[in-house]
Amino acid sequence: MLRFKELYQQKIIENLQKEFSYKNKHEIPQIKKIVINMGVGEAIADSKVINNAVNDLTCISGQKPVVTLARKSIATFKLRESMKIGCKVTLRKDRMYDFLERLVIVALPRVKEFRGFSDKSFDGKGNFTFGLKEQIVFPEINYDKIDTIRGMDITIVTSAKTDKESKFLLSGFNLPFYN
């Protein structure tokens, strides 16, 4: 079994219960899913770029991503409807905990000048979103084989009702916050 899943079941649930005194065990917040999105604006000019982004995201997540398409045409960006402009992957259950573990233990310590996350990254409903500027912080990415450095947005969706509950939950997984 995964370490972060065991950590949640054995320690974090107990700490959340003590802190917020829930009446029902189903009220205790948990992580529902993690969504990783990689927008590839260069794909407008060169369609091969999207394949490289898909390969990178597949290596990082361990799951094949879905290619996202433009919803409408925008002339100033030379964008047409249904053009490939990015890719995203939704992780649930064991893959979600596996990714979170690799993110906290391996990837975040490799980010340059990283002090922690801001409280402002919460959306008011308990979900947490942040961005990484480089995909090379993940050990699965071979630096010599990438064509360009790409960033990504990572959203952690929780069942928490408030940002305070969500922050307490994510702090239990050792996600660093500086506020």
From Swiss-Prot:
UniProt GO BP: translation
GO molecular function, one term: tRNA binding
Gene3D superfamilies: 3.30.1440.10
The entry's keywords: Ribonucleoprotein, Ribosomal protein, RNA-binding, rRNA-binding, tRNA-binding
One of the record's GO cellular component terms: ribosome
Summary of the function given for this chain in its UniProt record: This is one of the proteins that bind and probably mediate the attachment of the 5S RNA into the large ribosomal subunit, where it forms part of the central protuberance. In the 70S ribosome it contacts protein S13 of the 30S subunit (bridge B1b), connecting the 2 subunits; this bridge is implicated in subunit movement. Contacts the P site tRNA; the 5S rRNA and some of its associated proteins might help stabilize positioning of ribosome-bound tRNAs.
Complexes and interactors: Part of the 50S ribosomal subunit; part of the 5S rRNA/L5/L18/L25 subcomplex. Contacts the 5S rRNA and the P site tRNA. Forms a bridge to the 30S subunit in the 70S ribosome.
Family in the record: Belongs to the universal ribosomal protein uL5 family.
UniProt-recorded name of the protein: Large ribosomal subunit protein uL5
